[in-house]
Each structure stands twice: as C-alpha cells, then as structure tokens.
Amino acid sequence: MRNARSTLITTAGMAFAVLGLLFALAGPSAGRAEAAAGGIHVSNGRVVEGNGSAFVMRGVNHAYTWYPDRTGSIADIAAKGANTVRVVLSSGGRWTKTSASEVSALIGQCKANKVICVLEVHDTTGYGKDGATSLDQAGDYWVGVKSAAWRAQEDYVVVNIGNEPFGNTNYAAWTDATKSAIGKLRGAGLGHALMVDAPNWGQDWSGTMRSNAASVFASDPDRNTVFSIHMYGVYDTAAEVRDYLNAFVGNGLPIVVGEFGDQHSDGNPDEDAIMATAQSLGVGYLGWSWSGNGGGVEYLDMVNGFDPNSLTSWGNRILYGSNGIAATSRTATVYGGGGGSTGGTAPNGYPYCVNGGASDPDGDGWGWENSRSCVVRGSAADH
C-alpha cells in the first residue's frame, strides 16, 4: 500500500497487463534443492514450518512506522484470530528509520502474542517516483539490522525485502533488482524465509513477476523465497483472481496475497473471490490494514482509531465473514497450534497433500498427512 498514491492505470498499461498475464510460468525443476528444514521455509511450492507442518498466513497489516506508539495493535490483531502480522518498517529513506532495537522488540511482541512476524521495508514503494528507495538500499537496511535478535528467529520471522518495488515505470528492472537483493541478504547470512513483492505498485498488471517468478526463485541459493501479490483494483473479477493465483500454485511456486482490501480508488477489488480462492488453494492472505489509513483511503481501516472494539465494515468482513480470518486461521505449530493440512481442498472434499507425491508411495494419487488421507494435486484421485 502506498501513502495517498495515484493508481491510475493507462489503457496501454492494461494492454501490457493482458499480455503479461498470458505468459506461462516455467515452474522450478523437480530436482532442485530447497531450503533445509529449520524455520519457516518453502517445500514443494508451499510455505511450511520447521517441522514440516503447512503454514497458511491469515493476517493483517499494521502500519508501525507511522504509528510507533500503537504497538498494542499486534496483541489486538492476534486476539481477533490472526496467525500473522505484517509490520510496516522504514529504512530511513522516506520516514524515520526503524532501529535494530525496535525490530527486536517487534519480534518479541509477535512471539508473545503467538503470531508470525512478516517484517517489510516500506520506503521502496513505487520506486522510480515519489522519492522511493531501491531494493538494493532495502537490502542494506536488512543487513544493518540483522543483529536484532535474528539468530534463531527463523521459526517466527519472514523478511519482506521491500514493499511494492517499482511503480508503473521501469518495472522491467524488477527481476534483476529482486535477484540482487536476495543475493545480498543471503550473502550476509540471513537464512530466513524471504518475501518479495510484485512491481506495478504490487499488483503486477504487467505480468512481470508472474513471468519471472521461477527464475527469481531459482536465484535464491536457499530456494526459500515467497512471492507476494497485492490485490486492489486490478483484481476486480473472480476470473482475474483465480487466474493469477492458480498460475503460481499450478507451477509449484509459493504465493501469498500480501495486501488487499474491499474497495479502492483504482477500482473495486473482489475481496470475496480473493478470500475464497486463497482458501480453496491453501494460499495465505494479509489484509490492509488494521488502522491509521489516510489520504482518502480511510475506508481500508479495519477498526476505527485503533480501537479493537470498533470494527468497520471491512474489519467485520475480513475477520468474521465467509472464508475470513476467524474461521480459517490456524496458529503456527511453533506456538503450540494444531497446524494441519492446508494445501487446499480437492473436488472430492479431501485436502490436497501439502508434500505432493512424496506422501503417495504407491502412486495411486492418495497420500497420508496429519493423520488423514489427502489427494495428490493433478493425480487420478484429483476429481
């Protein structure tokens, strides 16, 4: 989410969007190495915990960098049932720098409230205009604060390198810039799961992330990068939502909806389709945002004035509506939650196997995970 941004998409831009979204993804090769077990990591195109249990994010964004005195919001969000909080930080390029000690304290609050912390640098929003900083500069920030209790925090923290890098210009540079930033963090010894946002203000209408995700994933020596799409006005139909998310899931690439709302100045996102499709596919989603929005998008607040007892219509929808957080969130097993198979549901009503064919030794399409039968996606049993 950008601060009071203009999200006008030109006719030419939409033409590129159509072309980009037609590109087929070449998924990661079956023989590639993936991140070694330990901490949140990617396995068979899914986000899992260190013990191999599937973890599907169901959470909320919190604008910490603009409201550093509202850290109680993490507890309030957790109390509503979220299993993840995406926390807005600043590298100092556009707003006051979030210090290493603040990062450490935020991780501590997430752990105390039994939620996974997705930490993101917001200064990169729309790089190329508005004074936004580069992904390379965001990488420098992460390297600089990695002493902030990073050791042994891989079970609890996902590092979202930079929010919505690249706006609607020069976005072709996203692929190389993202690969370079991943390399910088890995070279500095960060072993956490990484999250990378799409260009085009996070909405990837050009199909840049969709077309290049496989090569970006392969560039990570840990094979531990999760892709994040932000769904606002570009995703105003169920078909667009399903098409985008299925492109990643079908090609074994990890995807989450890192931001979305129920309305926006650039169009009317189909939040019902976003939540239903995410639930069906076992894909994580993080709604924007708890409170404190301005610049004409105050309707994206889930609660009024940071008061957890004063829900807005958007807050009620995402928390308690169909496929909402309260009904679908599962606490991470590292906190004692039950976990469970969350790879989505097959047409026959059985869950899909999170570990794919590895759970099906006899090759009949049926596997066994979490003490129950599961279906291997695309097998003869997938009907």
UniProtKB/Swiss-Prot annotation:
Entry protein name: Mannan endo-1,4-beta-mannosidase
pH dependence of activity: Optimum pH is 6.8.
EC class: hydrolase
Keywords: Glycosidase, Hydrolase, Signal
Gene behind this protein: manA
Signal sequence segment: 1-35
Subunit and partners: Monomer.
BP terms from Gene Ontology: polysaccharide catabolic process
E.C. code: 3.2.1.78
Residue ranges of domain CBM10 in the record: 339-377
UniProt-listed InterPro entries: CBM10 (IPR009031), CBM10/Dockerin_dom (IPR002883), CBM10_sf (IPR036601), Glyco_hydro_5 (IPR001547), Glyco_hydro_5_CS (IPR018087), Glycoside_hydrolase_SF (IPR017853)
GO function term, MF aspect, one: cellulose binding
Catalytic temperature dependence: Optimum temperature is 58 degrees Celsius.
Family under the similarity heading: Belongs to the glycosyl hydrolase 5 (cellulase A) family.
Reaction catalysis annotation: Random hydrolysis of (1->4)-beta-D-mannosidic linkages in mannans, galactomannans and glucomannans
